[in-house]
Amino acid sequence: MHNFLESEKAIHELEGKIIELINFADKNKVDLTYEIEILSQKLEQMQKEMYENLNPWSKVKLARLQERPTTLDYIEKLISGFTEFHGDRFYGDDTAIVGGIGLFEGIPVTVIGHQKGKDTKDNIRRNFGMPHPEGYRKALRLMKQAEKFKRPILTFIDTSGAYCGIGAEERGQGEAIAVNLIEMSKLKTPIIAIVIGEGGSGGALALGIGDRVCMLEHSIYSVISPEGLSTILWKDATLAQRAADMMQLTAQDLWSMKVIDQVIKEPLGGAHKNADLVADQIKTYVLQELKDLRMLKTEELLEKRYTKIRNIGIWK
């Protein structure tokens, strides 16, 4: 298969040509319908050939695209009256994780997710979506609040991993993640986790314990990045593509292993091509699952969640 980024560039160039023709036709009052149709058909064919045959490494690159919708994008489309909360009440706030309350189709919910930036400046402010311990403690504070007020919890996962700087380690990064895993496993309210981009290691898992876990079609979820694995195994980060092929990190792989419950389709070209469509599909999925989960008694909800967690990684 051609290099993913080269193919993506060719598609962008063709899209640009189509837009130019449309604008030229409008401005000069000429009929270019035939030419535009030919290019549109060519574009659709290129997209099908590219996106219907993606290898794992290409999916890694697609999951990392800066253009993909973020947690705040989905909150804007799915949650009305959203109010963001800040701070962990121990140390400070962490902009790599956003969280708050709002209404999902009239249902009061708590929403929490990793937040990457839209450009370089925003990424620096958001620490490229890599949370510090205070981010995970903020998330847990909101989850405990959701439990108290019996609000379902929605989490959006999109991080390359928890931040591994000295300050983060000194403030208890590992402990913060571990406590989230423990507490999320026994929260007395429904939890639905959605991987929307990168699901990197414990940094992703700290928001990923749920009664239902789903992934977007071109998202990834793994215990380590392909670059990290290739560096450990072969002392060579340039072998990341080989590592990705081995890791079974795609949504399809994880669904087949019963690690996740559902794969949500993305439009041709990825979620960034039609974020409204993806949001609608997330809405449909979450509505149905919340309907089922809210009918369960608390004891049954926790028992099913425990069984789900314990069954991950079991081979028969």
Curated annotation (Swiss-Prot):
GO biological process: fatty acid biosynthetic process; malonyl-CoA biosynthetic process
Gene3D superfamilies in UniProt: 2-enoyl-CoA Hydratase, Chain A, domain 1
Signal peptide per UniProt: none
EC number: 2.1.3.15
Listed HAMAP family: AcetylCoA_CT_alpha (MF_00823)
Function recorded in the entry: Component of the acetyl coenzyme A carboxylase (ACC) complex. First, biotin carboxylase catalyzes the carboxylation of biotin on its carrier protein (BCCP) and then the CO(2) group is transferred by the carboxyltransferase to acetyl-CoA to form malonyl-CoA.
Assembly with partners or alone: Acetyl-CoA carboxylase is a heterohexamer composed of biotin carboxyl carrier protein (AccB), biotin carboxylase (AccC) and two subunits each of ACCase subunit alpha (AccA) and ACCase subunit beta (AccD).
Protein name: Acetyl-coenzyme A carboxylase carboxyl transferase subunit alpha
Native source organism of the sequence: Alkaliphilus oremlandii (strain OhILAs)
The encoding gene: accA
